[in-house]
C-alpha cells in the first residue's frame, strides 16, 4: 500500500494539473482516497502486531475503524471517482457540479468523523459484536460521533443518487471530450445527449 501511495503521489507531480481538473469531482475523490488509505494504513500497524492485537484492539471498534477507512475511505471513493469520471460517457450529460460538491464534502467530513469516532471507541475498549453494553466513560460520546458521521455520509450518498438521476435527464450535454487535458488518455467521444 505504501508503494502505491508513493506511485500515485509522484504521478501527480509529473505534469502540472490544470485548474479545471483540480476542481473536478473525480479528482477530489481520488485525492481524498489517497489520504484515507494513509489514514487506514496507519491504523493497520497496530492490527499487524501480535501483542496490541490480542490485548488491546482485538474485537474492539478499532477493527471497524480500520475497515471503514480502507473500504469506504479508499476503495469506495475510488469507485465513486471512477463513476463521476465515466458519467458523461455513459449518459452524454454532465453531472451537477454543485450537488457533486455537496456529496463530496458531506462524504469526506462525515467519513472522517465516523472513522475517528470508531478509532477512539476502540481505543477505549468499546467491544464490537454486541448489541448491549455497559456505559463506560467516553463510549456514549464516541457513539454520538459515529452516528453523526454516519448520517452525514448517508446524506451525501442520497445527494449522489439524486444527482445521478437528475443529471441524466436535465444535466448539461457533455462535450465530445468532457475532460480536456493536454496529452489526455480519453480517446473516445462521449455519446450525444438523448433527444428530449
Set out the residue ranges of the language-model regions.
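Hydrophobic cores of alpha-helical transmembrane segments in multi-pass integral membrane proteins
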Residues: 1-12, 27-51, 61-92, 96-192, ...
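Membrane-interfacial, low-structure loops and terminal tails that flank and connect transmembrane helices
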Residues: 14-22, 182-183
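Active-site-adjacent structural elements in folded domains
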Residues: 16-17, 55-57, 146-147
Amino acid at each position: 500500500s505504501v508503494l502505491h501511495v508513493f506511485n500515485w503521489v509522484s504521478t501527480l507531480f509529473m505534469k502540472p494539473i490544470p485548474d479545471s481538473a483540480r476542481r473536478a469531482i473525480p479528482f477530489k475523490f481520488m485525492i481524498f482516497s489517497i489520504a484515507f488509505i494513509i489514514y487506514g494504513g496507519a491504523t493497520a500497524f497496530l492490527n499487524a502486531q501480535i501483542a496490541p492485537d490480542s490485548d488491546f484492539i482485538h474485537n474492539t471498534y478499532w477493527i471497524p475503524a480500520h475497515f471503514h477507512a480502507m473500504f469506504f475511505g479508499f476503495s469506495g471513493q475510488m469507485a465513486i471517482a471512477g463513476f463521476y469520471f465515466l458519467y458523461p460517457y455513459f449518459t452524454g450529460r454532465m453531472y451537477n457540479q454543485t450537488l457533486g460538491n455537496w456529496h463530496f464534502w458531506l462524504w469526506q467530513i462525515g467519513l472522517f468523523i465516523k472513522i475517528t469516532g470508531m478509532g477512539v471507541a476502540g481505543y477505549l475498549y468499546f467491544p464490537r459484536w454486541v448489541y448491549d453494553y455497559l456505559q463506560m466513560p467516553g463510549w456514549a460520546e464516541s457513539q454520538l460521533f459515529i452516528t453523526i458521521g454516519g448520517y452525514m455520509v448517508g446524506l451525501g450518498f442520497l445527494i449522489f443518487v439524486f444527482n445521478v438521476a437528475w443529471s441524466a435527464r436535465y444535466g448539461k450535454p457533455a462535450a465530445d471530450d468532457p475532460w480536456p487535458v493536454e496529452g489526455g488518455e480519453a480517446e473516445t467521444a462521449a455519446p450525444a445527449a438523448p433527444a428530449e
